[in-house]
């Protein structure tokens, strides 16, 4: 299983999750380990996404 890269909400950087659930759980990765949940405020929604507080970080993207 190849490493999955997702946008880490902190500093807007990508990181390798190395098969962990960081991307699907909305956590940020650091050195291949989960290091904290993303907050709605940290999420960067795509253009046109107007979820407000209903925005959640999943796989580097925000979904309503």
From Swiss-Prot:
- Ribonucleoprotein listed as a keyword: no
Task: Recite the UniProt keywords alphabetically.
Answer: Metal-binding, Metal-thiolate cluster
User: Does the record's keyword annotation contain Metal-binding?
Assistant: yes
Q: Which domain of life is it from?
A: Eukaryota
> Which Pfam family, any one of them, does this sequence belong to?
Metallothio_6
Q: What Gene Ontology terms describe what this protein does at the molecular function level? A: metal ion binding
The record describes the protein's role as: Metallothioneins have a high content of cysteine residues that bind various heavy metals.
Q: Give the family from UniProt.
A: Belongs to the metallothionein superfamily. Type 4 family.
Please identify the protein, giving its name as recorded. Metallothionein
């Amino acid at each position: 299983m190849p490493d999955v890269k997702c946008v880490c909400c902190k500093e807007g950087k990508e990181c390798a999750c190395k098969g962990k659930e960081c991307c699907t759980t909305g956590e940020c990765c650091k050195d291949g380990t989960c290091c904290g949940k993303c907050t709605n405020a940290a999420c960067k929604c795509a253009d046109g996404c107007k979820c407000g507080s209903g925005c959640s970080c999943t796989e580097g993207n925000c979904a309503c």
